[in-house]
């Protein structure tokens, strides 16, 4: 099992549109391709607003295949075009990291995340 963390710069002027798109469309389409979204957060770093989410994958190959299929999805690409035309860019820079647990790391579980 590996994890992936994605950090998106989002903009205050259209943050609500970003969250609507991710909640109502992106996460739904992602799940249809096997994405296992563990948790999602919003945070601030200085003046930058960020949307951060954690994914679980069985292996790196599965992760790459799922992302390829998601990015090629016709519904997703149509939604991106429509929301960009209506609200402008919803995402600035994107950081993407694959996380491989150390031998001494406690296991991540949804229950443990819910307790924090």
Spell out what each predicted region is.
Residues 1, 5, 91-94:
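Sequence-level motif detector for i,i+2 pairs with an aromatic at +2
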Residues 2-3, 7-9, 19, 42, ...:
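Accessory recognition modules or surfaces
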Residues 17-38, 58-99, 116:
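An amphipathic, aromatic/His-enriched active-site/gating alpha helix that lines ligand/cofactor pockets
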Residues 102-106:
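A short acidic, often aromatic-flanked loop/helix-cap motif at beta-alpha or helix-coil junctions
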Residues 109-116:
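C-terminal/domain-terminus segments
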């Amino acid at each position: 099992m590996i994890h992936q963390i994605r950090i998106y710069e989002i903009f205050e002027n259209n943050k609500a549109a970003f969250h609507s798109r991710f909640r109502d469309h992106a996460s739904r389409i992602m799940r249809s391709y096997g994405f296992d979204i563990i948790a999602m957060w919003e945070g601030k770093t200085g003046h930058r607003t960020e949307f951060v989410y954690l994914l679980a994958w069985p292996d790196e190959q599965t992760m790459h295949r799922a992302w390829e299929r998601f990015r090629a999805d016709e519904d997703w690409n149509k939604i991106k075009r429509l929301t960009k035309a209506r609200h402008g860019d919803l995402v600035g820079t994107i950081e993407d990291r694959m996380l491989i647990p150390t031998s001494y790391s406690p296991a991540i579980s949804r229950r443990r995340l819910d307790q924090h």
